[in-house]
Structures are given as structure tokens and as C-alpha cells.
Design a protein with these regions (language model features):
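Local sequence-structure signature of Cys/Sec-based thiol-disulfide redox active-site neighborhoods
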Residues: 1-26
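Surface-exposed beta-strand edges and their flanking turn/coil or helix-capping segments
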Residues: 18-20, 42, 68-69
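Polar/charged alpha-helical tracts
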Residues: 21, 34, 61-65
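A short beta-strand-loop structural module common to alpha/beta enzyme folds
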Residues: 26-34
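Positions that flank functional sites
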Residues: 34-35, 51
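Short secondary-structure boundary/hinge segments and terminal tails
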Residues: 37-38, 54
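Structural micro-motif
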Residues: 39-47
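Non-catalytic, surface beta->alpha helical segment in thiol-disulfide oxidoreductase systems
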Residues: 48-69
Length: 69
């Protein structure tokens, strides 16, 4: 499974990053705004799971479901 976090370092991005780390979910982080815009992302954080983008709410739900919490 490929997990990518698109982040600008905003407070919500940092919260999601900490949640991922606390659950030992490995991910790559992309901070290049041009890449985000080219993918059509107009807000962050976005967590991409195997090519499927999730907004913050969806991402936190995915993390909780994946880890049984």
C-alpha cells in the first residue's frame, strides 16, 4: 500500500502527521505546492492511499478504521 501525505506544514497537517506516526503508518510526504496544484488539490492536508485522495476528515477515519480504533 502506498501512502502519501500532501502537506504545507500547517497545524492540521501536523496533527495528521502525528496521528500517522502514532499508529506506525509509514508514508511519503510531499510539500511541493506545484505538485499539489497539478493534482487538483486546493487544500491540505490530503492523504493519498494507493492513488485515492482523502481530505482530513476522511484520512482520520481511514487511520482509525485501519487500526481498529
Amino acid at each position: 500500500m502506498k501512502v502519501i501525505l500532501y502537506s504545507t506544514g500547517c497545524p492540521i497537517c501536523l496533527k495528521l502527521k502525528e496521528l500517522l506516526k502514532s499508529k506506525n503508518i509509514f508514508y511519503d510526504e510531499i510539500t511541493d505546492i506545484d505538485i499539489m496544484l497539478n493534482k487538483g488539490f486546493d487544500s491540505v492536508p490530503i492523504l493519498e492511499i494507493d492513488g485515492k485522495p482523502l481530505d482530513y476528515k476522511q484520512a482520520t477515519q481511514w487511520i482509525k478504521e485501519r487500526n481498529g480504533n
